[in-house]
């Protein structure tokens, strides 16, 4: 008969506990990683990932978020295009361009609406984009936001670039040029819109992207939407649904726990306190997460792409595989 001393039993129990702990730790580490493109700029795009990571929504939904932050939008998209990262949240018409250039991407949901895209003017006599005829607008001509403005003005019979002179400038420079009276209007997005209204309350918003898009299409449009690379979906078939659930969790924090979201924005993107809250409370920052494969949502995304083709940005529509389907 084999007997054990009390000391031997204690040692055996400790060893079992250590093995059990190691097994649990190893199991926890088995969550698949998803590498995402983010930005070091003080904008709301990286805040989505920051809230997701800080709140543990990645682990809650079965994956580990691996954030890769880049100092420029071009590097942000380039990393996704080359496969350095596997997911991002980007402009639907920019993703359209990448797809047609051979990037194997799949749009699987929606993100921010066009409500945070605004055009500011200082002159009280300028009340709409039509009033900018013969004047100058500062805008980033390489961004999807400019494409939205171009599509809108086309629908209104305004030749943007001819009737309205466009000065190419990123959002911060566009705002600075309006401040210095070098242009008559500036295209900006959140959080710069809320910062601008705090610093220059006399400036007027003469165009809002969501309102303008609904005016010409009868439906909402999307500023940014989430996409995954096709090989990531092949490796991890549940990735779209896991990410979509985590994005919905982020949207809930933005809209229902705005003070907590504002604190994360201050801590991680160095935004002034209250700016995110102002953007959400004003209705300019609207995060609406829906599956892209639902018929109405798919149509709202592809409609933007069709209008980009009609406006002359691209020659043809992408095939149906650009939208993920379970």
What does each model-found stretch correspond to?
Residues 315-326:
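Hinge/cleft segment of the Venus flytrap/periplasmic-binding protein
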Residues 4-11:
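N-terminal export leaders
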Residues 18-26:
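C-terminal segment of classical bacterial N-terminal signal peptides
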Residues 93, 167, 172-265:
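Pocket-lining segment of extracytoplasmic ligand-binding domains
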Residues 11, 134, 198:
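Phosphate-coordinating loops and pocket residues in cytosolic domains that bind phosphorylated ligands
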Residues 234-313:
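Secondary-structure end/capping motifs
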Residues 59-60, 210-219, 287-296:
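Short, solvent-exposed loop/beta-turn-alpha elements that line the ligand-binding surface or hinge
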Residues 28-161, 165-170, 184-190, 206:
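Short, glycine-/small- and polar/acidic-enriched structural segments
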């Amino acid at each position: 008969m084999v007997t054990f001393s009390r000391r031997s039993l204690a040692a055996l129990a400790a060893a079992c506990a250590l093995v059990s702990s190691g097994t649990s730790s190893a199991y926890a580490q088995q969550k698949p990683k998803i590498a995402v493109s983010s930005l070091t700029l003080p904008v709301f795009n990286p805040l989505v990932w920051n809230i997701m990571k800080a709140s543990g929504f990645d682990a809650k939904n079965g994956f580990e978020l691996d954030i890769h932050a880049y100092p420029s939008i071009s590097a942000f998209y380039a990393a996704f295009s080359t496969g350095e990262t596997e997911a991002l949240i980007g402009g639907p018409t920019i993703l359209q361009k990448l797809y047609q250039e051979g990037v194997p991407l799949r749009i699987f949901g929606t993100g921010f609406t066009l409500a945070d895209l605004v055009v500011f003017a200082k002159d009280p006599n300028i009340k709409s984009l039509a009033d900018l005829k013969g004047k100058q607008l500062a805008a980033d001509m390489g961004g999807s936001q400019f494409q939205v403005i171009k599509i809108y003005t086309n629908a209104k019979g305004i030749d943007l670039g001819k009737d309205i002179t466009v000065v190419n400038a990123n959002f911060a420079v566009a705002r600075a040029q309006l401040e210095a009276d070098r242009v008559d209007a500036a295209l900006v997005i959140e959080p710069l819109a809320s910062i601008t209204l705090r610093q220059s309350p006399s400036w007027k918003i003469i165009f809002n992207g969501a309102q303008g898009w609904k005016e010409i299409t009868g439906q909402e449009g999307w500023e940014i939407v989430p996409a995954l690379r096709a090989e990531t979906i092949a490796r991890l078939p549940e990735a779209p649904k896991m990410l979509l659930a985590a994005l919905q969790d982020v949207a809930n924090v933005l809209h229902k726990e705005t003070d907590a979201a504002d604190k994360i924005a201050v801590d991680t993107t160095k935004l002034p306190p209250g700016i995110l809250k102002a953007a959400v409370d004003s209705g300019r920052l609207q995060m609406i997460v829906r599956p892209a494969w639902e018929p109405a949502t798919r149509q709202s995304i592809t409609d933007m792409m069709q209008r980009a083709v009609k406006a002359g940005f691209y020659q043809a529509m992408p095939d149906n595989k650009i939208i993920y389907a379970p």
